[in-house]
Amino acid sequence: MRTLLIVAVLLVGVEGSVYELGKMILQETGKNAATSYGFYGCNCGVGRRGKPKDATDRCCFVHKCCYKKLTDCNSKTDRYSYSWKDKTIVCGDNNPCLQEMCECDKAVAICLRENLNTYNKKYKIHMKFFCKKPDAC
């Protein structure tokens, strides 16, 4: 099952510790990261940038901006640790950059949960050419 989740999240093309981010999104939203957010709107998934279509898409936009602020770590390859305590994500890493990356991922997972009511199936597989120039971070 773990291998399937890793492959699914890799297909989405999310950055960062893909396994942890996929788990966080599943824990917070109950949705599979790959199938629900892999091509959502203009900002969810790798290489996708544009003016957010809704609050759900804005979560992904803010997540990309959060990653741009990271220093001294590689959001595509570095891994961090976190735990799930009392239905709460707890980032726990001694490396400051990995801690920041975990906090970015935690924030997007919570944002996606808080905006489940804005999730629009018509944006689930949204073509990139429909996206307008993105706002600045």
UniProtKB/Swiss-Prot annotation:
CDD domains: PLA2c
GO molecular function terms noted in the UniProt entry: calcium ion binding; calcium-dependent phospholipase A2 activity; phospholipid binding; toxin activity
GO BP annotations listed: arachidonate secretion; lipid catabolic process; negative regulation of T cell proliferation; phospholipid metabolic process
Tissue: Expressed by the venom gland.
Site (Cationic membrane-docking site (MDoS)): 128, 133
Site description Hydrophobic membrane-disruption site (MDiS), residues in chain: 127, 130
Sorted UniProt keywords: Disulfide bond, Myotoxin, Secreted, Signal, Toxin
Record's protein name: Basic phospholipase A2 homolog Pgo-K49
Organism lineage string: Eukaryota, Metazoa, Chordata, Craniata, Vertebrata
